[in-house]
Each structure stands twice: as structure tokens, then as C-alpha cells.
Amino acid sequence: VANGQGITLGTLALVDGTGLASNYSLNSASLNITERVLNSSGSKTYDANTNALAGAITLSNLVSGEALNHSGTATISSANAGSYTITNLAGITIADGSGGTASNYTLTGGTHNFTVNRRVVGVSGTRLYDATTNAVASDLSTHTNLVGTETLNLSGTGTIASKNVGSNKTVSVGTLALADGSNGGLAANYTLSGGTHQLTVNQRPLNATLSRQYDGTTTSAGSDLSSFDALQGGETLFLSGTGTVTNKNVSSGQSVTLGTLALDATGATALVSNYSLNSASLNIIQRPISTVYLTKLYDASTTVQASDLQTMSNLVGSETLTLTG
């Protein structure tokens, strides 16, 4: 850059215009070299501020083979995701670079564009096995890579490849969608595209109810199973092994010490690995006396007395009972 530099005329010559060149002579010439106007462009990921750092900006319109260094911070008009013109370049300083002299260039008057890209969000969470491949928004409560204290809301349903229990299963986005949250969190500044989305499916705990007739023991066998409280999707399971209760007598809802009681999928439609046995309770119901034999001498009456008892069947072990009335 210079003003009024003398020019060695070389082959410079006058030619006819509206006048005749022969009426004039070229005595001298001078050249003003002005600064070359630089353009700039850049981008960053949304970070909730209006800074455009030099490291995110690329200079253009340099003379071929020349390069410049630049440093500092420019400003854009909004922190939100979108395309902007840099409004304040005063904070950017250009310096000599490889083959390039800073004084030959200026940022003033150029075209300066800057893009703020959406920030990629990851979502993850945990739920109990439910016999589906759904990953609903309410199960994906952890949102990562948000700026500062910003929060977002999530709606919709994604999917996982397998319904079965497992850790960190990849979630396909499906209809999952971000919505504005709190502390300045705007959905338009974020995207699920390209994020890491994971769901852990844990075993669903089952509580078993067992029922049997009084048998004089405190044993509760898997074959006494009456029902489970939380099987999913119409699935079936059974029990094997034995547990114990503290009271052998007729009762309802006695807590069972599980012992060797275990979930058993033999002949069932469910996988044992998708469930855990949390607890069991036992209902002991009265044992019916199937036959009572009474004998009496003919006495011309239709009365049968308890004292006529001879035997009872279906009693447990050596237990005995008497009749009255």
C-alpha cells in the first residue's frame, strides 16, 4: 500500500480517445496502491454468547500465495443458532502471515458472515423391562451437552432394537423431539441429530403369590404358584424350588423366605433374564376332610352324634381331630 509511487513508464503510451494522442505527450505517471478488502466467514456451535472468535473465522480475498494471521474476537447480533453478518470486527486484528503483509489489507468494507450451528444433544435413561422396544421421552431424562444451566424438554417415542434387558442400548430417534426448557434453553438451538442416545432396560421385579392347602409344614414350593403381579405383555413364567414360612397354619399373605425359589421359564413364554424375583407370599387355605366315617347301632332315630365317629380321611400325618355335636 502506497500513495503517489512513481511509475517507470515502460510500454505505457497514449492512444486516441475523443482526442488525438499525437497532440499530447506522456510525461510521467504515479500509482496509488490501496488496501485490499478482506472478506471473512466462519461458524461455531451454539454456546449462548455472541462472540465470534478469530479461530472460528476464515479470511478470504487474499492475493494468491499470501496468507495472514488474525486474532481476537468479533461480535454477532444474536447468540442463537442461525446465519448472521458480523456486526463488530473491531476486536479482530490482522497480522503479517506467510507472504502476506497486514498493512496491505483491511477488514473494513468486506463481506463478513458467521453461522451458529445447533448444538448436538444426547439423551439417555433407564426403565424397567416392559416387553416393548419403545424408548419414551419420560424414560430419557438425562440430557447431555447442554450449555450452562439451560434445560430442554423432550416428547415423543424412540425405539431400541431389542425389547430385552440390556445396558446402553442405542435409541433410534423416531418421534422424539426437543422443546423449550428453562434457564434460556431453546429447542431451536439444539438438535438430536448426530447425538448419542441410549436406554438401559433393567429387570422387572416380580412379586409372587403362592397358595396351597394346609399340609402341616412350613414349606412353600414353586408348584404352589398362583400368580405374579407384574408380568408384561401377556407373558408367562413359573417357579421352581422351595421356600419357607414361619407358620404352618392356615393364614393369608405370609412372607416367604425365598430359599431356592427361582423363576423358571420351562414351558413359559417369557425370558427369566427379563425379570427378577423380588418377593413371595403364601396363602395357606383349609384342608378339606374328604370322608368322615361314623358308625352307630340301630336306635330307630335319624340322629348321628359326634361320638359315632369312627375315622376321618385326608388328615395330615399323624394329626387327629374330634367331632362335637
List each language-model region with its residue ranges.
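Short loop/turn motifs that initiate or flank beta-strands
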Residues: 1-325
